[in-house]
Swiss-Prot record:
InterPro entries named in the record: GlycerAld/Erythrose_P_DH, GlycerAld_3-P_DH_AS, GlycerAld_3-P_DH_cat, GlycerAld_3-P_DH_NAD(P)-bd, Glyceraldehyde-3-P_DH_1, NAD(P)-bd_dom_sf
Keywords: Calvin cycle, Chloroplast, NADP, Oxidoreductase, Plastid, Transit peptide
Transit peptide feature, positions: 1-83
Gene3D superfamilies in UniProt: Dihydrodipicolinate Reductase, domain 2, NAD(P)-binding Rossmann-like Domain
Feature type site, description Activates thiol group during catalysis: 265
Listed name of the protein: Glyceraldehyde-3-phosphate dehydrogenase B, chloroplastic
C-alpha cells in the first residue's frame, strides 16, 4: 500500500528543464493549422482530411532529446538541472483529465503532477483517462499500481478521494500548486481551503467569484502576474479565453465602442442528459435534444483582463447538441471608420504571427466544428465569416475547443506560476536549449551554426 509520504521524500525533485517559454513559441503551418505537436502520441486523436494534427519532430525537439541531466558534482553539460514544482489536480473531470494529457505532452514542463483528488477512486480515474469519448484512447501506458496509485509511462501519480479540501494531504505531499477543477471551490474561502491544507498556490479553472481573486488570460494579461500578487488566481472561462485575445486586437487596432457576443457552445456536464430538475429551467431540458439559451459571463469577464472595456461588452450562450468545440460570434461598433473585412483579418494575422502566436490563429478554409477538435489555440478566426457593415460595425466569428484548448492555457498559466517562483526564476531558459548552451560556450563548434 503506497503511503502519502512515499511520494514526498523530496520537496522539489530535480529534473532536466528546457525552455519555459517554448510552450508558447511554435512553428505553424499556413491557413488553418494547429500547433505542430504530436497530439496523437498522447491524446489518441486521428486527424480529419482537412487539418493535420500530427507533425514531424522539430529541430528544437531533436536538440532537446540530446540534452542530459547534470549529475551531482559533474562538470557542466548541456541541459540545466532545475527544480520542478509539485502539482495536485483537484477534480478529475473533463478539465482535470484534459489538463493531465496536455501536461503529459510537454516534456519540458516545470511541473510535476503527483496526485489527483477524484471521488471515483483509482479504477474510475484510470479508465476515464485512458478511454475518452472525445479525445480517443490515451496512447500513454496507463497502469494501476495499487488502490491508491496509478502510473503514466512509469510516472506514479497518487489518487486520493475526499470532497473536503481541508482534509487533503497537500502538506504531507509537499504540494506547490493545486489545479482546482471541480467548479465548486471558485471563491476565496473555498479555494483557500487548499492553502489551509498546505498548498502554496491555487489555479481555478473557471471564472472566480469575488474581486479578491485576479484573473489571467494567456496572451492578454499574463504578464501582470507576479508571485506575490495572490496565492489564488483564476484562468477565467473557456469562452473568455477565446474572446479576450481577438477582442484585444480589435480594441488596439480599431477601438471598440460597444458590442454583443453569442457563443454557440457544446453542452457541458452542468446540463441534464434527460429532462430533470435544475436551478436554470432551460438547462433542465435534455442537452442532446435541444438548443438551450442560457447566460454567460464571458463577455463581461473580458473587462477583468482588459479593464478599458468595462461596460462595453455583453452576451449570451446557446448550448447545442454537440459534445465539444464551440464558436463565438462577436459584433462590435468601432471608433475607426472605413475599414474592410480584409483590414480586420489582416490585423488578426499580424497578431497571430506576433504577440499572440500560439494563442490566436486565422483559418481561411471553410471548416466545421469537428475540424477544430483538439486545437491548441484559444481562438481561431474564421476569416471568411468576418463582416463589416457601414464601415464601423464589425462581425467576427472564432472557433475554440472549449476543453482541450482551454486546458492548454491552464498548463501555460501553471508554467508561468512556476517560472515566477522564488528561487526558480534564475533557472528559466531562453526558449532554445542550444542558445542557452552557446551563451556560456560561444566557442563550441555547434554554436557556429548560429553565426
Amino acid at each position: 500500500m503506497a503511503s502519502h509520504a512515499a511520494l514526498a521524500p523530496s520537496r522539489i525533485p530535480a529534473s532536466t528543464r528546457l525552455a519555459s517559454k517554448a510552450s508558447q513559441q511554435y512553428s505553424f503551418l499556413t491557413q488553418c493549422s494547429f500547433k505542430r505537436l504530436d497530439v496523437a502520441d498522447f491524446s489518441g486523436l486521428r486527424s480529419s482530411n482537412s487539418v493535420t494534427f500530427t507533425r514531424e519532430a522539430s529541430f528544437h525537439d531533436v536538440i532537446a532529446a540530446q540534452l542530459t541531466t547534470k549529475p551531482t558534482g559533474a562538470a557542466p553539460v548541456r541541459g540545466e538541472t532545475v527544480a520542478k514544482l509539485k502539482v495536485a489536480i483537484n477534480g478529475f473531470g473533463r478539465i482535470g483529465r484534459n489538463f493531465l494529457r496536455c501536461w503529459h505532452g510537454r516534456k519540458d514542463s516545470p511541473l510535476d503532477v503527483v496526485v489527483v483528488n477524484d471521488s471515483g477512486g483509482v479504477k474510475s480515474a484510470t479508465h476515464l483517462l485512458k478511454y475518452d469519448s472525445i479525445l480517443g484512447t490515451f496512447k500513454a501506458d496507463v497502469k494501476i499500481i495499487d488502490n491508491e496509485t496509478f502510473s503514466i509511462d512509469g510516472k506514479p501519480i497518487k489518487v486520493v478521494s475526499n470532497r473536503d479540501p481541508l482534509k487533503l494531504p497537500w502538506a504531507e505531499l509537499g504540494i506547490d500548486i493545486v489545479i482546482e477543477g471541480t467548479g465548486v471551490f471558485v471563491d476565496g474561502p473555498g479555494a483557500g481551503k487548499h492553502i489551509q491544507a498546505g498548498a502554496k498556490k491555487v489555479i481555478i479553472t473557471a471564472p472566480a467569484k469575488g474581486s479578491d481573486i485576479p484573473t489571467y488570460v494567456v496572451g492578454v494579461n499574463e504578464k501582470d502576474y507576479g508571485h506575490d500578487v495572490a496565492n489564488i488566481i483564476s484562468n477565467a472561462s473557456c469562452t473568455t479565453n477565446c474572446l479576450a485575445p481577438f477582442v484585444k486586437v480589435l480594441d488596439e487596432e480599431l477601438g471598440i465602442v460597444k458590442g454583443t457576443m453569442t457563443t454557440t457552445h457544446s453542452y457541458t456536464g452542468d446540463q441534464r442528459l434527460l429532462d430533470a430538475s435544475h436551478r436554470d429551467l432551460r438547462r433542465a431540458r435534455a442537452a442532446a435534444l435541444n438548443i438551450v439559451p442560457t447566460s454567460t459571463g464571458a463577455a463581461k469577464a473580458v473587462s477583468l483582463v482588459l479593464p478599458q472595456l468595462k461596460g462595453k461588452l455583453n452576451g449570451i450562450a446557446l448550448r447545442v447538441p454537440t459534445p465539444n468545440v464551440s464558436v463565438v460570434d462577436l459584433v462590435v461598433n468601432i471608433e475607426k471608420v472605413g475599414v474592410t473585412a480584409e483590414d480586420v483579418n489582416n490585423a488578426f494575422r499580424k497578431a497571430a504571427a506576433g504577440p499572440l502566436k500560439g494563442v490566436l490563429d486565422v483559418c481561411d478554409i471553410p471548416l466545421v466544428s469537428v475540424d477544430f477538435r483538439c486545437s491548441d489555440f484559444s481562438s481561431t478566426i474564421d476569416s471568411s465569416l468576418t463582416m463589416v457593415m457601414g464601415g464601423d460595425m464589425v462581425k467576427v466569428v472564432a472557433w475554440y475547443d472549449n476543453e482541450w484548448g482551454y486546458s492548454q492555457r491552464v498548463v501555460d498559466l501553471a508554467d508561468l506560476v512556476a517560472n515566477k517562483w522564488p528561487g526558480l526564476e534564475g533557472s528559466v531558459a531562453s526558449g532554445d536549449p542550444l542558445e542557452d548552451f552557446c551563451k556560456d560556450n560561444p566557442a563550441d563548434e555547434e554554436c557556429k551554426l548560429y553565426e
